[in-house]
C-alpha cells in the first residue's frame, strides 16, 4: 500500500516523474498563510458544530499556529513528496499533535480547500494592487498640479496634433487607473463568496456551518452550488483580466517615457535611480525601468490567455489541469505589483523639459485647429469650409518652411479675404491651450481643478 495520505487504494507509490509533474509545492507554498487561515476557520466550525471534540480542536488550533510560526521563521521543511501546501501543512501538523491532526480534514476536500486558499490570496492581492494604483494616481496628480501650465504637444498617430499641458497628460493616466481600481474592486466583490465546505464536489453529509466559516474568513456568504464552488476559476481570470488592462495602461505610459527620454525627443528626464548605463557606450542613460514595465505587460496578458486556454475544455467539476491556475496568476499579479511600484517611482522623480516641450508644441502646425475655429467664430464660416481654408494656409506655410504665425496678413487673405490681424492671437500655443475650457479640456485652470480634486479624493 502507498504511504501517501490518499494512498489506501494504491499498491505502490507514484513514479518519480509522476511526483515531479504532480508536485505543486514549489509554487503553492505561497498559499501557506491562506491555507492555515482556512484550516483554523474550518476546525473552529467543526468544534462549534459538535463534529470534533473540544480537546482535538484545541490541539489542532495550537498545532496550526506552530506550523504558521515555523513557516514565517523560515524553518519549515517543504518536501516535494508531500505534493502541495495542504499535505505539507497536514503532515507537519500530524508530527506536532499526533492522530488528532487527521480529524482536520473532516467534511473537507483539497478541492474546496485550494479554491478557498486561492480566493483568499487573490482577494488579498487585489486589495494591495488597489492601494498601489492609488499611490501612482497620487504621484500623477501631484505632477499634474505642478505642471498644469507646462505646454507640450498632444499627439494623434504619433504626429503633432494640438497643444496640451503636461499636467493634462498626467491626468489622463489618473483616469485610466481609476477604471483599473474599479475593476479590481469589482473582481474582489464577485469573488467574495466562500467555497469552503463544498468538499470534493457534492457537499458533505456532516452538519457543517458554511455561513460561519465564510464569516470567519471575511467572505460575504458561502457559494450556493458545490459543483460550481470547486470548478470555478473565474475569480482568477477576472483578476488577471483587470491586471492585464492595467498593465496595458502602464505599458502605454512606459512606451511614452522610452520615446520621450530619447535624445531625439528630450521631453523628460528620468532620475539616475530609474535608468542604467551601457557596458560599452559611456554616454548612455537607458530607460530600463520603463522598458521592463512595457515588457512585463506581455507576461501579464500571457497569464490571462494561458488560464483561459486551460479552463476552456474542462468538464465539471475539478480536474488536475486547474493546478495550472497558480503559477501564472502568482507571477502576473506580482509582476503588476512591481510595475506599479516602478512607475510610481519614475513619476515622482521625472522632470519635464519645459523649453523643449514648448518648442515641440508649436511645431507641426499644431494650432491649425485653432485657426479653423477662429474662422468659424469670427467670420461665420461653416467648419468644413474653415477646415479647407486652414488646410490651404498650412500648405502655403509648409512650402515656405515656416509656421502659420509667420505668414503675412496678405498671404492669409489670399485664402480668405476677411481674415484680420486678430487671427494671430490664436496661433500661439499658450493661447491655444488656455482656450480649451470645455469640461475635461486641457486649459490650465481645468487641469488645476481636476488635479486638486484628485489629490483631495485620494487623501
Swiss-Prot record:
Gene Ontology MF terms in the entry: argininosuccinate lyase activity
Recorded catalytic activity of this chain's protein: 2-(N(omega)-L-arginino)succinate = fumarate + L-arginine
Keywords of this entry: Amino-acid biosynthesis, Arginine biosynthesis, Cytoplasm, Lyase
Annotated SUPFAM superfamilies: L-aspartase-like
EC number annotated for this UniProt entry: 4.3.2.1
Any one Gene Ontology BP term: arginine biosynthetic process via ornithine
NCBIfam families, per database record: argH (TIGR00838)
HAMAP family the UniProt entry points to: Arg_succ_lyase
The protein, known as: Argininosuccinate lyase
Organism whose genome encodes this protein: Methylobacterium radiotolerans (strain ATCC 27329 / DSM 1819 / JCM 2831 / NBRC 15690 / NCIMB 10815 / 0-1)
Gene name for this UniProt entry: argH
Amino acid at each position: 500500500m502507498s504511504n501517501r495520505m490518499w494512498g489506501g487504494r494504491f499498491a505502490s507509490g507514484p513514479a518519480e516523474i509522476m511526483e515531479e509533474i504532480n508536485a505543486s509545492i514549489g509554487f503553492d507554498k505561497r498559499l501557506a498563510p491562506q491555507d492555515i487561515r482556512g484550516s483554523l476557520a474550518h476546525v473552529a466550525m467543526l468544534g462549534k458544530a459538535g463534529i470534533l471534540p473540544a480537546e482535538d480542536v484545541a490541539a489542532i488550533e495550537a498545532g496550526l499556529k506552530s506550523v504558521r510560526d515555523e513557516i514565517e521563521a523560515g524553518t519549515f521543511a517543504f518536501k516535494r513528496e508531500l505534493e502541495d501546501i495542504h499535505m505539507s501543512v497536514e503532515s507537519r501538523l500530524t508530527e506536532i499533535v499526533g492522530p488528532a491532526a487527521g480529524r482536520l480534514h473532516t467534511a473537507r476536500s483539497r478541492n474546496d480547500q485550494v479554491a478557498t486558499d486561492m480566493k483568499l490570496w487573490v482577494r488579498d492581492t487585489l486589495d494591495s494592487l488597489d492601494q498601489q494604483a492609488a499611490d501612482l494616481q497620487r504621484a500623477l496628480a501631484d505632477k499634474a498640479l505642478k505642471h498644469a501650465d507646462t505646454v507640450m504637444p498632444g499627439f494623434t498617430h504619433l504626429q503633432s496634433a494640438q497643444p496640451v499641458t503636461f499636467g493634462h497628460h498626467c491626468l489622463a493616466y489618473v483616469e485610466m487607473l481609476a477604471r483599473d481600481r474599479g475593476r479590481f474592486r469589482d473582481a474582489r466583490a464577485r469573488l467574495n463568496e466562500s467555497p469552503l465546505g463544498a468538499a470534493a464536489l457534492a457537499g458533505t453529509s456532516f452538519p457543517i456551518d458554511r455561513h460561519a466559516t465564510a464569516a470567519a474568513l471575511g467572505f460575504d456568504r458561502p457559494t450556493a452550488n458545490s459543483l460550481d464552488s470547486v470548478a470555478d476559476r473565474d475569480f482568477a481570470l477576472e483578476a488577471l483580466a483587470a491586471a492585464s488592462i492595467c498593465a496595458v495602461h502602464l505599458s502605454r505610459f512606459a512606451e511614452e517615457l522610452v520615446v520621450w527620454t530619447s535624445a531625439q525627443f528630450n521631453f523628460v528626464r528620468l532620475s539616475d535611480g530609474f535608468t542604467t548605463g551601457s557596458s560599452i557606450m559611456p554616454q548612455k542613460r537607458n530607460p530600463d525601468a520603463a522598458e521592463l514595465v512595457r515588457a512585463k505587460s506581455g507576461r501579464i496578458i500571457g497569464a490571462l490567455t494561458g488560464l483561459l486556454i486551460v479552463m476552456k475544455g474542462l468538464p465539471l467539476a475539478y480536474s488536475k489541469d486547474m493546478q495550472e491556475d497558480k503559477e501564472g496568476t502568482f507571477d502576473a499579479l506580482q509582476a503588476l505589483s512591481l510595475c506599479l511600484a516602478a512607475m510610481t517611482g519614475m513619476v515622482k522623480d521625472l522632470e519635464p523639459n519645459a523649453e523643449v516641450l514648448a518648442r515641440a508644441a508649436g511645431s507641426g502646425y499644431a494650432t491649425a485647429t485653432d485657426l479653423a475655429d477662429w474662422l468659424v467664430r469670427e467670420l461665420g464660416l461653416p467648419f468644413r469650409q474653415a477646415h479647407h481654408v486652414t488646410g490651404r494656409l498650412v500648405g502655403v506655410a509648409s512650402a515656405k518652411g515656416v509656421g502659420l504665425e509667420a505668414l503675412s496678413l496678405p498671404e492669409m487673405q489670399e485664402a480668405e479675404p476677411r481674415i484680420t490681424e486678430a487671427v494671430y492671437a490664436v496661433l500661439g500655443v499658450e493661447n491655444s491651450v488656455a482656450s480649451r475650457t470645455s469640461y475635461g479640456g486641457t486649459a490650465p485652470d481645468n487641469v488645476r481643478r481636476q488635479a486638486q480634486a484628485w489629490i483631495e479624493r485620494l487623501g
